[in-house]
Design a protein with these regions (language model features):
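Acidic, low-complexity terminal tails and accessory targeting/binding regions
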Residues: 78-100, 144-147, 162-217
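General small-molecule cofactor/ligand-binding pocket signal
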Residues: 5, 72-74, 197
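Glycine-rich phosphate-binding loop signature in dinucleotide/nucleotide-binding domains
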Residues: 42-45, 141-146
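Internal catalytic-core helix/loop-beta-alpha segment
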Residues: 109-144
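Loop-to-helix element that buttresses phosphate recognition and phosphoryl-transfer chemistry
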Residues: 4-62, 125-135
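Active-site metal-binding loops of divalent metal-dependent hydrolases
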Residues: 10, 154, 200-202
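Generic beta-sheet signal
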Residues: 4, 144-152
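Phosphate-coordination/substrate-recognition cap region in phosphate-metabolizing enzymes
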Residues: 35-109
Length: 217
């Protein structure tokens, strides 16, 4: 039985209209990661950190400041292509890309339902391909020695949680919308069975004066 720690990246460029504009940490995102790194320095250290290959995931790892822990990247931990899926939904079903937080909350289940049902343009990664690659990343990490942390994104973490709990798309959407920036999640692999043992911990943001840093962007 192997336990893996997954961390969502810090706050990125909220309000961005495309992946390239979104994919870097805000000043607050760097601060969130620094605070989390301070917590990790006080507990049993990780033996290795593996992040996705996206800029926001790499910057989160770097800003945690755990310089004595080896860091490598695995693109299988990259986020799903939400902007691409949203554009596919617009083209195929005429559903416009949301411009507000409220509209986004309604848009997510529409995107995930279309994606899971295969109603997306052919150039996009399928839902099954996405699940296969992120589970492959977990199995790879589980085969390494020591305590391993994985720095990834909302879609990856919410999907793993949904797989472990056997959730449908509607319930998965609720998870997707509640994965806080730099939150900490834990999963155990028992053979091929995935079990979630912790969801959404924020030990570095519990103080009252850090309430402003509890973000989802």
């Amino acid at each position: 039985m192997v336990e893996l720690t997954l961390i969502r990246h810090g706050q990125a460029q909220t309000g961005a209209k495309d992946e390239a504009s979104y994919d870097s940490l805000s000043d607050l995102g760097h601060q969130q990661a620094r605070w989390l790194g301070e917590v990790f320095q006080e507990v049993e250290p990780f033996d290795q950190i593996i992040s996705g290959a996206m800029t926001r995931q790499i910057e989160t790892t770097q800003s945690m400041g755990l310089t004595n822990v080896p860091h490598s990247t695995d693109a299988r931990l990259n986020e799903l292509d939400y902007f691409g899926l949203a554009e596919s939904l617009r083209v195929r079903q005429g559903i416009e890309v949301p411009r507000s937080i409220q509209a986004f909350a309604l848009h997510v289940p529409q995107v995930l339902e279309a994606w899971r049902g295969g109603d997306v343009t052919e150039n996009l990664e399928s839902y099954d391909e996405f699940c296969s690659r992120i589970m492959g990343a977990l199995h790879n990490a589980a085969g390494l020695d020591g305590r391993i942390a994985l720095v990834s994104s909302t879609g990856v973490i919410a999907t793993l949680a949904a797989i472990s709990l056997g959730l449908d798309t509607v319930k998965k959407t609720k998870l997707f919308l509640r994965v806080m920036n730099t939150s900490v999640h834990k999963f155990q692999l028992v053979g091929n069975d995935l079990h979630m043992t912790q969801f959404g911990a924020i030990p570095h943001l519990e103080q009252a004066d850090r309430a402003h840093a509890r973000t989802y962007g």
